[in-house]
């Protein structure tokens, strides 16, 4: 069995294989300030004839505010009030406006475990696959059903395995790797499949680097993006759950059946850039060098961790941000922000001319601060570059690694980080 088949077998209480339809028990459900209000409304619709309108298990639900925080409109403030009230009445854990982005906060708080079946009303919920969980995004209507029953139906997905070997070259990182894979298979290459990332390269990555990989599985159409749990996973979880021991069961068997397997050697991989207006429009940085920039956005659930921002800051050194360029730095969580603060990186970046914001989604969702105007060009370490994703539909967004973002912030144009 693949690890995905094992997880669905546990969740449904019976052995299953790819293609089977199952009613599965959910281990953890997450919603946030954008999709949560509709889920709550749907929950009360489902429960309208019930005398006691209670969620199935409040200990397995997490609500987090991260998209419009602090509230940037009256509507956002009203949504926050509604969700706070719901969380209090139901006894649900609510991470308010000060904690950070859902896909960073849940793992760092110990909510995600290997073998879990996790759903979130956000498309990048696949990020938790970095810890060996099967996690996937669902809509608010499905989330309402989960709130009420703790169950959801699935078609057990086929698995697309990516075997990656070789040591990543200097100043080439996991973001370059996942962009390369997406560029190779396309935005629908793994549609409704469990993307399973394996091989010596993947095993060499830290958990933050793995989070970047799993986070972007949806950008190749993946239902989930799983990396088998190992000693690196165990060490990460032991820091959050004292005495945690990894169960070796949660990995694919040697005889597991895959829909497809692709092999990659990344020993000579160059820094990669996703060009407007699709994530699979991927080119080597050498092909787009010199593209003038108005803004660089460093952050998001894809690359907003301490490791990421440190990479960018170290490349920039003591040099200032290029004239005419706005550098926005948005850490993924309060915990990551405090690490940066204690290490001196916040002061260093601000002295260089960066704007360091409180932890949140920031420009990534296109509805808060730091948006691009018509004709403007931005480089971002986030995960999507569709038209209008980070502001005007007439703007242009390129996606890159933190290293490329740092080098480009110095020069004011897309720059190969190996040349700085």
From Swiss-Prot:
- Pathway assigned to this chain's UniProt record: Amino-acid biosynthesis; L-leucine biosynthesis; L-leucine from 3-methyl-2-oxobutanoate: step 2/4
Name a GO molecular-function annotation.
3-isopropylmalate dehydratase activity
Q: Which Pfam families match?
A: Aconitase
* Co-factor requirement: [4Fe-4S] cluster
Q: Which reaction does it catalyse?
A: (2R,3S)-3-isopropylmalate = (2S)-2-isopropylmalate
The main enzyme category here is lyase
- Known EC number: 4.2.1.33
HAMAP family in alphabetical order: LeuC_type2
Similarity field: Belongs to the aconitase/IPM isomerase family. LeuC type 2 subfamily.
Q: What does this protein do?
A: Catalyzes the isomerization between 2-isopropylmalate and 3-isopropylmalate, via the formation of 2-isopropylmaleate.
Subunit-structure text: Heterodimer of LeuC and LeuD.
**What is the name attached to this protein's record?**
Probable 3-isopropylmalate dehydratase large subunit
- Encoded by which gene? leuC
């Amino acid at each position: 069995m693949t690890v995905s088949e094992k997880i669905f077998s546990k969740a449904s209480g019976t052995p299953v294989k790819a293609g089977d339809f199952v009613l599965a028990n959910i281990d953890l459900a997450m919603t946030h300030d954008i999709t949560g209000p509709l889920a709550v409304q749907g929950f009360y619709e489902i429960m309208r004839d019930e005398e006691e309108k209670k969620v199935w298990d409040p200990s397995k639900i997490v609500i987090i505010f991260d998209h419009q925080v602090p509230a940037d409109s009256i509507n956002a403030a009203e949504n926050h009030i509604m969700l706070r009230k719901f969380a209090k009445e139901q006894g649900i854990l609510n991470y308010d406006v000060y904690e950070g982005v859902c896909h960073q906060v849940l793992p760092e708080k110990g909510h995600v475990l290997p073998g879990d079946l996790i759903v979130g009303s956000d498309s990048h919920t696949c990020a938790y696959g970095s810890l060996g969980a099967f996690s996937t995004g669902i809509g608010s209507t499905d989330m309402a059903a989960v709130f009420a029953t703790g169950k959801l139906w699935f078609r057990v997905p086929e698995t697309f395995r990516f075997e990656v070997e070789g040591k990543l070259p200097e100043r080439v990182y996991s973001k370059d790797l996942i962009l390369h894979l997406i560029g190779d298979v396309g935005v629908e290459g793994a549609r409704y499949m469990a993307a399973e990332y394996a091989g010596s390269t993947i095993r060499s990555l830290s958990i933050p680097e793995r989070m970047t990989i799993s986070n972007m599985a949806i950008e190749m159409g993946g239902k989930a993006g799983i990396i088998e749990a190992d000693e690196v996973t165990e060490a990460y979880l032991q820091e959050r759950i004292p005495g945690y021991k990894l169960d070796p069961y949660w990995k694919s068997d040697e005889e597991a059946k895959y829909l497809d397997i692709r092999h990659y050697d990344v020993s000579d991989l160059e820094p990669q850039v996703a060009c407007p207006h699709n994530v699979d429009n991927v080119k080597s940085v050498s092909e787009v060098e010199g593209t003038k920039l108005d803004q660089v956005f460093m952050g998001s659930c894809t690359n907003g961790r301490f490791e990421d921002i440190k990479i960018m800051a170290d490349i920039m050194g003591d040099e200032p941000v290029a004239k005419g360029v706005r550098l926005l730095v948005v850490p993924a969580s309060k915990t990551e922000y405090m690490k940066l603060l204690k290490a001196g990186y916040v002061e260093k970046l601000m002295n260089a001319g960066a704007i360091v914001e409180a932890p949140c989604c920031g420009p990534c969702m296109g509805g808060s601060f730091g948006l691009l105007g018509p004709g403007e060009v931005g480089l971002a370490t986030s995960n999507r570059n569709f038209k209008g994703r980070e502001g005007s539909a007439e703007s242009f967004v390129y996606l890159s690694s933190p290293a490329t973002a740092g080098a480009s912030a110095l020069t004011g144009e897309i720059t190969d980080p190996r040349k700085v």
